[in-house]
């Protein structure tokens, strides 16, 4: 059975020429939405997948704007609003050492180098120079950890465990 990964959500149309507005959940939008790539639009239940070929991609504000082959006006893409864009596992490329897919990191437990449990990574933000991992703590507010070498010491995907160095002012 094919394992599917969510790479974005279609939140609206854009203009009248069949462009859709996507909130991306992918690590590499420029690669994922490359012209000619096949993506799959899933229904709400995740039981049907409509293959679509990307004909254009551009970024606009915080959204990715896409058009698909054979869908040339707003009326044809209106039905996709609220749908998820997915890719099968075999479309996930190999990453360099020290690089991870979001789905591999989200859900990992986070501990300090002293072994103190801090919580679980629930989200990854990309505000600029480096990603920021949002850690849900058992009690209190979420913790924001920059994904930099000085802080993130070890990532063990198999055990879903991340070890960090707590810099002054981080907690």
Curated annotation (Swiss-Prot):
This is Ribosome maturation factor RimM. The PRC barrel domain binds ribosomal protein uS19. Keywords: Chaperone, Cytoplasm, Ribosome biogenesis, rRNA processing. InterPro entries: PRC-brl_dom (IPR027275), PRC_barrel-like_sf (IPR011033), RimM (IPR011961), RimM_N (IPR002676), RimM_N_sf (IPR036976), Transl_B-barrel_sf (IPR009000). Binds ribosomal protein uS19. The keyword Chaperone applies. It comes from Bacillus cereus (strain B4264). It is found in: Cytoplasm. GO terms for molecular function: ribosome binding. Residues 96-170 form the PRC barrel domain. An accessory protein needed during the final step in the assembly of 30S ribosomal subunit, possibly for assembly of the head region. Essential for efficient processing of 16S rRNA. May be needed both before and after RbfA during the maturation of 16S rRNA. It has affinity for free ribosomal 30S subunits but not for 70S ribosomes. Pfam families: PRC, RimM. GO terms for cellular component: cytoplasm; ribosome. Belongs to the RimM family. GO terms for biological process: ribosomal small subunit biogenesis; rRNA processing.
């Amino acid at each position: 059975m094919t394992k599917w990964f969510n790479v974005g959500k279609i939140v609206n149309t854009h203009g009248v020429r069949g462009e859709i507005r996507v909130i991306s959940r992918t690590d590499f939008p420029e690669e994922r939405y490359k012209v000619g790539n096949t993506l799959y639009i899933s229904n709400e239940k995740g039981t049907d997948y409509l293959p679509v070929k990307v004909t254009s991609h551009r970024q606009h504000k915080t959204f990715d704007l896409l058009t698909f082959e054979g869908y040339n006006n707003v009326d044809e893409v209106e039905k996709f609003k609220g749908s998820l864009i997915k890719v099968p596992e075999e479309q996930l490329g190999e990453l360099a050492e020290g690089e991870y897919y979001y789905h591999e990191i989200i859900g990992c437990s986070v501990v300090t180098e002293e072994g103190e449990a801090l919580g679980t990574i629930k989200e990854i933000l990309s505000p600029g120079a480096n990603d920021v991992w949002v850690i849900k703590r058992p009690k209190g507010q979420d913790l924001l950890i920059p994904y930099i070498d000085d802080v993130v010491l070890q990532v063990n995907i198999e055990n879903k465990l991340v070890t960090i160095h707590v810099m002054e002012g981080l907690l």
